């Protein structure tokens, strides 16, 4: 009977160890849970960026205003008949 109780105690101890510290145990669960939260935050940021890109793509496909704005700001282009004026501030000496 003592041997049976000893075996059951050892089995219970082994099961508790694997539950708390073993593969797919509680410690792994909490680690994976924190990894999931971090990945969800990254995914949210990427979804927001993708939404902005889709909106810009739609704007470029449908209207000439966005194309004109990009040409003016990124390429420095002007419309025919426009004059470009640059105002330079004074440097402190």
Swiss-Prot record:
It is found in: Cell inner membrane. Residues 1-3 are cytoplasmic. Keywords: Cell cycle, Cell division, Cell inner membrane, Cell membrane, Coiled coil, Membrane, Transmembrane, Transmembrane helix. Its main location: membrane. The chain crosses the membrane at residues 4-21. It comes from the Bacteria. Residues 22-93 are periplasmic. Pfam families: DivIC (PF04977). Residues 42-75 form a coiled coil. It is a single-pass type II membrane protein. GO terms for cellular component: cell division site; cell septum; plasma membrane. GO terms for biological process: FtsZ-dependent cytokinesis. Essential cell division protein. May link together the upstream cell division proteins, which are predominantly cytoplasmic, with the downstream cell division proteins, which are predominantly periplasmic. Part of a complex composed of FtsB, FtsL and FtsQ. Belongs to the FtsB family. This is Cell division protein FtsB. The lineage of its organism: Bacteria, Pseudomonadati, Pseudomonadota, Gammaproteobacteria, Vibrionales.
